[in-house]
Every structure is written in structure tokens, then in C-alpha cells.
Amino acid sequence: MINRKKSIITLCFVLMLPFASWAEAPVIDDSENFAMIDRQEEYDAPLVNPKYDNPQIESAELDGSQNDNYSTDTSQSYDEPALVKEDRSTISDNAKLIDKIQQLQKEIQELRGQLEVQAHDLKLLQQQQVAFYKDLDSRLSNSSTSAKTIQNDKPATDVSLGSNSPATLKAASPQIKRGPSTGPSNSKPQPVIAVSRANPA
């Protein structure tokens, strides 16, 4: 499978090579070398017949009619307000972006704070659940040990499963021995411990 993928990728590259040779013209950036080419042309030009035998020198004295046709406007008032408007718009856009970034940073800080609070609450809930299950386990283990001691204290009785006659039921039920009653009972009632069955979480 891996060899198959490699061969497909290699085949694609091999098929793309002819497309590069069929390109119409290569793209060359001559912006840096443009001045060097001009200098080389000056040196390569023939010295026998120069292009301009008599160079034309412009005279500073022009006729008035020709001078009126060429008006020079050096104020360029149309450029300045446009630049100012662009500067103002970019400044206002930048200010809006900065405000939005600050608002987003505040929201992120608030969300991080909420996340920390929720993580703390979750940790407390987990601790409460662990405490609840440990308490439940200790109660169950205490009740199972007390049930075992009660079963060990009972006398062994022979119970036959075959008949349900009243004689066998009387024999199967444990006998409670009561001593002579000389008055009120000497045993003190044990206090009742209130146990909450609600989930502490």
C-alpha cells in the first residue's frame, strides 16, 4: 500500500515535468538588473555612427505662446485631502480594531475565570462524592459485620424443607427466654442516632 502511494506520487511528478517545459515564457524579475543592462548597452553601442550626432539642447527662452500651453500646477490640492481622508479612515479602522481586541481579551479573561470557578466546583463535587461513597461503604461494612455477629449468636435449628406443618414451624422459630420479672426492666433504652439519608453532594 505504501509502495503504491509512493509510485503514484512519483508518477504525478514525472508527468508534471513536461508541463514546465511547455510553458510559454519564463517569468524573470529584471527590476534590480535593469540599470545594469542599460549601462551594458551604452558600452556595446557602436562608436562610429552615434545615434545623435548633434544633441539637441533645450533653450530656456521659449515663446510666450508655447509657454502658455504648458501650465504647471504645483499645489496638488486634490491629493492632500484624499490622503487625509484615507489616513483618518485607517486611523478610525485601527482604533475600532484595537477596541474590539481589548473587548475580546476581557471576554477571554472572564471566560477563563468562569472556567476556573467551574473546575473548582467540580473538584469539590468529586470530593463530596468520594466522601459519600466512603461513608456508605463504612455503613454497609458495619451493618454486615453486625449481621454476621447476630447470625453467629443464634442457636442452630433443624429445619426440614419437606413439610410446612405447624409443628415444624414452631420448632424452627427461636425461643426467647424470659427471666422472672421482678418489676420494671433493668435495661436502659439505647439512644437513637439520627442518620441522614440525603446525598451530601
Curated annotation (Swiss-Prot):
Signal peptide: none
Organismal lineage: Bacteria, Pseudomonadati, Pseudomonadota, Gammaproteobacteria, Legionellales
Name listed for the protein in its UniProt record: Uncharacterized protein in pal 3'region
Pfam family, one: TolA_bind_tri
InterPro entries reported in the protein's UniProt record: YbgF_tri
Region annotation (Disordered) ranges: 46-80, 143-201
Composition-biased stretches (Polar residues): 64-78, 143-167
GO biological process, one term: protein trimerization
Superkingdom of origin organism: Bacteria
